[in-house]
Swiss-Prot record:
This is Transcription factor MYB10. Gene3D superfamilies: Homeodomain-like (1.10.10.60). Residues 11-63, 64-118 form the HTH myb-type domain. It comes from Arabidopsis thaliana. Expressed in cauline leaves and siliques. The gene is MYB10. It is found in: Nucleus.
Amino acid sequence: MGNRRAPCCDKSQVKRGPWSDEESERLRSFILKNGHQNWRSLPKLAGLMRCGKSCRLRWINYLRPGLKRGNFTKEEEDTIIHLHQAYGNKWSKIASNFPGRTDNEIKNVWNTHLKKRLVKRSISSSSSDVTNHSVSSTSSSSSSISSVLQDVIIKSERPNQEEEFGEILVEQMACGFEVDAPQSLECLFDDSQVPPPISKPDSLQTHGKSSDHEFWSRLIEPGFDDYNEWLIFLDNQTC
């Protein structure tokens, strides 16, 4: 078997349980007069039926001068929470930042008070996050439903709007192409002014010379090959 540290005292010959006021005063008086160089031998020298470890803890946590009693302030509690996040359960290291406070006292206030507060705060924060997410989801769903309904209304109204626009466009086109013109050409001419239709006579009436008859016959039924020949013919007739 490996080397084991010998117990500080015979447990069968030591007293257990709470310290009495008489025991506490005897320990205080001895340490203030002689100091505490060796905790193993101190109980026997002080006349106490306690083990060395119990004497040391009683002195450090309750009897030594300069201990700060009473409840922790709000600033002390916040500092303990901050240091616990950095050091964990290293109570002696945390207690070194609190003059007059013991590591045992800090451990007790953490386990009985501060840890429960953090648990409640975490639960409250989680519930708030869930509520906010639910409200946000509900608001988003309502917004989506409203948007869909608006699109449906717009689409249902759009055919009627297109039909009305088509009717207006047809009316505007009809007005644009309307011409302020007389319904009949009779208003442009009197009956005496309208020329009679021209038709080819069945027989030619002869008036004057035979050359005139020849001229008009060729004019009505031209037989010239080209325009120049026709002009020459006209010149000959006028000479």
